[in-house]
Regions:
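Internal insertion modules embedded within essential enzymes
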Residues: 1-31, 35-328, 332-359
Length: 359
């Protein structure tokens, strides 16, 4: 045994360490690797459930760097799971990626459960169970530009879509399935049809030219709603405030317009020339990330590569928990927002991203 160990040590490369499993099998790792790197090298489930280590038959911390010739025995438990702190000391890309994957999956499971809880409170247990397997739920996910019911629940749990939006779209889908033709149009349907009729009138564009971003509020003071920050490409509605406060432009599914009576709603639409002129509008994003040095810089670089201007950036951190990044970016369309969010969401350390209001 000693001769075998000595022969291996003679052939070691400076950048590697060679250690042994309890059965005497040799495992090569990058220099500086720890018990966590070793555990993930054995199997992802060993890494995901390790809670301690014996090195040369002595209890050691998981962050202890392994030395050539060490015998490593990983202690596991079904209730153990990775810690974000491990990312501060692991040395191998395999371990780092597996920890990220576990945390993303765990975070997704939690947000899906939160989404389920929100819907179940509104619909009751039996109604919620029926909803999960319904075509209506699938179509609502599609309308929210999401791939599946699970994606919709996760987006609801994180706040990327609101309960109000989901319930409103569910009502529409259920009405369609139960012959909505026999029922009166909702206020939202009426407003949408008015907007469509207005959009069909060519003289409107000639009368207002290309400089007016919102058509339907000519001669009136208006502002974009801080609560939803509408973008060109999104269906919008104007609301008239009590008193002399002008018109506020909201996304059509903004929760804040639910309590506003129909007589104070104004059909409006985006001028198609807005996107051609390259006008930009503020959008607020909330991003949850695995906390590490340089994560904000990496996100800002990704946005810069896409020629996206960032006008404000703030980070909130708490030890052992995901960091939260609040960004204000300037975008010209709903489609650009969708692409931008997908690009950020695809980054390794990003757990989730949602569009938010300004306050």
């Amino acid at each position: 045994h000693n001769d075998y160990l000595a022969s291996i040590k003679e052939d070691l490369f400076d950048e590697e360490v060679f250690v042994f499993t309890p059965k005497g099998e040799v495992v090569g790792l990058r220099k500086g690797s720890t018990a966590v790197d070793f555990a993930y090298r054995i199997h992802s489930e060993v890494g995901n459930h390790c809670h301690g280590v014996r090195i040369n038959d002595r209890l050691s911390t998981l962050s202890t760097p392994l030395q050539n010739g060490d015998f490593v025995n990983i202690l596991t438990s079904k209730t153990a799971h990775p810690s974000l702190d491990w990312l501060n000391f692991v040395a191998t890309p395999t371990a780092r990626n597996r920890i990220r994957q576990w945390y993303k999956r765990s975070h997704r499971d939690e947000t899906i459960q939160r989404g389920k809880d929100l819907l179940e409170r509104e619909l009751g247990r039996s109604g919620f169970d029926a909803l999960l397997s319904s075509e209506a739920m699938t179509r609502v996910a599609e309308r929210c530009n999401l791939q599946s019911t699970e994606d919709l629940l996760a987006a609801l749990g994180f706040g990327a879509v609101t309960l109000h939006q989901v319930l409103n779209r569910l009502r529409e889908e259920v009405r369609l399935q139960t012959e909505a033709q026999a029922q009166p149009l909702s206020n939202e349907d009426v407003a949408r049809k008015l907007v469509e009729q207005q959009a069909d009138g060519a003289p409107t564009r000639e009368r207002h030219g290309d400089s007016q971003p919102i058509l339907g509020v000519e001669g009136l003071d208006y502002r974009l709603g801080r609560c939803c920050g509408p973008l060109p490409g999104e269906a919008i509605v104007g609301t008239v405030a009590l008193g002399n406060h002008g018109i506020t432009i909201h996304c059509q599914d903004c929760p804040n317009i639910e309590a506003i009576p129909s007589e104070r709603r104004l059909p409006v639409r985006w001028n198609p020339a807005v996107s051609r002129e390259g006008q930009r509008f503020p959008v607020h994003l909330r991003i949850e990330v695995i906390d590490r040095v340089g994560i904000l810089k990496d996100i800002l670089m990704r946005l810069s590569d896409g020629s996206i201007n960032v006008s404000d950036a703030r980070v909130k951190t708490a030890y052992g928990k995901p960091a939260r990044i609040e960004l204000q970016v300037e975008l010209g369309s709903a489609e650009l927002l969708r692409r931008t969010m997908n690009q950020i969401r695809s980054m390794a350390d990003v757990l989730d991203i949602a569009r938010t209001g300004q306050g």
